[in-house]
UniProtKB/Swiss-Prot annotation:
UniProt: ATP binding residues: A42, P43, S44, G45, A46, G47, K48, S49
Keywords, ordered alphabetically: ATP-binding, Cell inner membrane, Cell membrane, Membrane, Nucleotide-binding, Translocase, Transport
Annotated localization: Cell inner membrane
Membrane topology classification: Peripheral membrane protein
Protein name per the record: Lipoprotein-releasing system ATP-binding protein LolD
Amino acid sequence: MSEMLVLDGLTKAYNRGRPGEVTVLRGATLSVGTGEVVALVAPSGAGKSTLLHIAGLLDTPDEGRVAIGGTEMAGLGDRARTGTRRREVGFIYQFHHLLPEFTALENVVLPQLANGVSRRGAEARARDLLGRVGVGAREGHRPAALSGGEQQRVAFCRALANAPRLLLADEPTGNLDPGTSDQVFGVLMDLVRGTGLSALIATHNLELAARMDRVVRLEAGRVV
């Protein structure tokens, strides 16, 4: 299996060299194979959000290397890194962060327009994705008119709008009640499997973690 994501020896500290320095990652190393879904299990404060931000090129490590799809990120300038992030990586967070003034459809269309997709093509893909997660009939509703589970399904579609090869998710169902969480996670897994994505999904829920291909644990900034 080829590797879609490689994180090798990541170290990250905030306020480095100053009073109040906090080391968040201490040589964290992991990989995600092509088409593999990996659970990242970590207690609060272990550094999982920082690790995901570095993996998604939203932050840089103090030490260590990041490779996406076989390309080393260290040699890329800011513009190239931004382009790689937009093309290759989709993000899902615990809270949906949908734009409240736009409909469900527009929330999935807009990221595509920003990447140069025609409106016609963007709307067609958005409708396909919304239909696949069971909220196609709600495409004209704004986020406030949707249930929590529906909002998160739209967020899944937005994350996949530009057909990334790598999905990073930080507690994607953590804001939902247990019953809804289980159902919505099933929708996410069907979507990931159906598109052949590689995914690194952080969760506290060991039952959800067990449904993925492999589980890695992050403790005190280290993968154990």
